[in-house]
């Protein structure tokens, strides 16, 4: 027996609003969409996992498509449903088995490090430690786009190093990964590929173009 046709829960504006969590849209789609529809839009599986991979635009498109195509729960044959579910279950089980492989598949680090000044070689930061750094960031053509090193003596007195928790995504990945290899007092030159910097989008506010390789001189002055 066909299930009752659901009503639209949100307007287009509400769907695109930041106040509406992705998980709510996914739950609605999983509650009301047929399994083949969900499989086609890669929406089957644990809501948390789906939310990690699906962006808001994809969910809005799927939501509108569900009402346009009317492929609601209970609108397709059982054999077709079980086949779709079987396929998705197989795919869902794969990441668990290949998790360690996925890490290996990333290839070499997307940065290179040259030590300019050796550290104490005993105090290394761990994930979640607060690190304190002086730095200068330049583009490949030598343009300085950011620095916290002051040149005038007046400003030098008030200058403070950049402090943040390392290894948890507070900064670009190239920094997170490289700082975990540095010891207290070390100064290094980091050449970071776009994938571990600002990627395809760049950082227009800082005048960093898309796909830019960034060069930083970073000094790790302290670890908490």
Curated annotation (Swiss-Prot):
Q: Which residues carry this modification: N6-acetyllysine?
A: 99, 170
Query: What regulation of activity is recorded for this protein?
Result: Inhibited preferentially by rapamycin over FK506.
Gene3D superfamilies per record: 1.10.720.80, 3.10.50.40
- Pfam families named among the record's database cross-references: BTHB, FKBP_C
Task: Specify residue ranges for compositional bias: Basic and acidic residues.
Answer: 89-102
Which residue intervals make up region (Disordered)?
89-113
What EC class does the entry list? Answer: isomerase
Query: Per the database record, which ranges form the PPIase FKBP-type domain?
Result: 128-224
Where does it live in the cell?
A: Nucleus
Question: Which InterPro entries does the UniProt entry name for this protein?
Answer: FKBP3, FKBP3_BTHB, PPIase_dom_sf, PPIase_FKBP_dom
Q: Taxonomically, which superkingdom? A: Eukaryota
Catalyzed reaction equations: [protein]-peptidylproline (omega=180) = [protein]-peptidylproline (omega=0)
Q: Which residues carry this modification: N-acetylalanine?
A: 2
Chain's role: FK506- and rapamycin-binding proteins (FKBPs) constitute a family of receptors for the two immunosuppressants which inhibit T-cell proliferation by arresting two dinstinct cytoplasmic signal transmission pathways. PPIases accelerate the folding of proteins.
Similarity annotation: Belongs to the FKBP-type PPIase family.
The record's listing under PANTHER family reads:
PEPTIDYL-PROLYL CIS-TRANS ISOMERASE FKBP3 (PTHR46493:SF1)
Protein name, per record = Peptidyl-prolyl cis-trans isomerase FKBP3
Which species does the entry assign this protein to? Answer: Bos taurus
What are the leading ranks of the lineage? Answer: Eukaryota, Metazoa, Chordata, Craniata, Vertebrata
């Amino acid at each position: 027996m066909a299930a009752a046709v659901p009503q639209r829960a949100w307007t287009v504006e509400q769907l695109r609003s930041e106040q509406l969590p992705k998980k709510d849209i996914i739950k609605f789609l999983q509650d009301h969409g047929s399994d083949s529809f969900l499989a086609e839009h890669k929406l089957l599986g644990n809501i948390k996992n789906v939310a990690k991979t699906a962006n808001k635009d994809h969910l809005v498109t799927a939501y509108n498509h569900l009402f346009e195509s009317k492929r609601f729960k209970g609108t397709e044959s059982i054999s077709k449903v079980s086949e779709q579910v079987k396929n998705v279950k197989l795919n869902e089980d794969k990441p668990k088995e290949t998790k360690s492989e996925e890490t290996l598949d990333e290839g070499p680090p997307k940065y290179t490090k040259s030590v300019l000044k050796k550290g104490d070689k005993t105090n290394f930061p761990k994930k979640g430690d607060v690190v304190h750094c002086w730095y200068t960031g330049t583009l490949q053509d030598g343009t300085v786009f950011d620095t916290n090193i002051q040149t005038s003596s007046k400003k030098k007195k008030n200058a403070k190093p950049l402090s943040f928790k390392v290894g948890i995504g507070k900064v670009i990945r190239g920094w997170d990964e490289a700082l975990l290899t540095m010891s207290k007092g070390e100064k290094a030159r980091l050449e970071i590929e776009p994938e571990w910097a600002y990627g395809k989008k760049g950082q227009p506010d800082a005048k960093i173009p898309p796909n830019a390789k960034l060069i930083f001189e970073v000094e790790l002055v302290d670890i908490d």
